[in-house]
Amino acid sequence: HVISEKPVTLSLNELDSVIKVADECGKLFTVHQNRRFDVDYLMMKQVYASGVLGDVFGVESRYQGSRGIPGDWRGHKEHGGGMLYDWGIHLIDQMLGIVYDRKIESIFCRLEHITNDEVDDGFKLDLYFEGGLDARIEVGTSHFISLPRFYMTGRRGTAEVNDWRDRTRIVTCREWHEDDVKPVVTSAGLTKTMAPRDEKTVDESWLDRPESDGHDFYRNFTRAMDGKEPQLVSHEQMRRDLEIIEAAFESDKQGRIIPFDDCHFGK
């Protein structure tokens, strides 16, 4: 039985060949998707599934730092370097775990080369889901001020995790109509459109951080070895993540949106 380091392989064809051998030998093969146990991710997954925000139309997931790529394999293309392989594979897997009930229609990706010409040291990846939901996955290594770790918007509210160590802030709309909107005064004039809402029309709440144990990944794998439960990260899920990685590279290469023939990820 084998647990591979992420991203698992550097191509879908290579992954398929490994899966074929594993099946022929009757052995388990999976990838170490330890970020499925990140608490910030688990909170946003809970918010989406609860429906508290109404029909969700936007999800943003980011990791940003300011130290560039570490001076090891991550800087070399032949060894699977670059942030899309290193962090992208985790954040893609998380996004598909959050938006579990929609198909991807197309994707667009732009890679960044701020400090490294050989591999990407950052990227912006947009996943366009059916029903008008747009998801942005972004990683940067030259950012000295970070944007929120997670940001989710729906027709009835917004949820935010500012930092991976924080709780989730949720603001929902209690009453859409306001009788008297107080305009914001700027140096260039007044605006009511972007004026903050009256506290009487919104509710604010906080979702506490749940308990999580990354060792559950290994506990699952040992039980799967004994035939007691299916492995947590399935072959289908590994293929799906890598399909998106390959499509992202192709999108950046061609400079255009790539249509994506998709299937449901599975809740």
What are the roles of these predicted feature ranges?
Residues 1-36, 51:
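Beta-strand-loop-alpha-helix segment that lines the small-molecule cofactor/substrate pocket
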Residues 3, 28-30, 60, 108, ...:
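Structural detector of well-ordered beta-strand residues that form the stable sheet scaffold
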Residues 16-18, 44, 247-248:
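Aromatic/hydrophobic pocket-lining residues that form π-stacking "cages" and hydrophobic walls in ligand
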Residues 89, 116, 138-146:
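Glycine-rich phosphate/pyrophosphate-binding beta-alpha loops
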Residues 156-232, 236, 258, 264-267:
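C-terminal glycine/acidic-rich active-site capping loop/insertion
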Residues 239-252:
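C-terminal hydrophobic helical "lid"/dimerization subdomain
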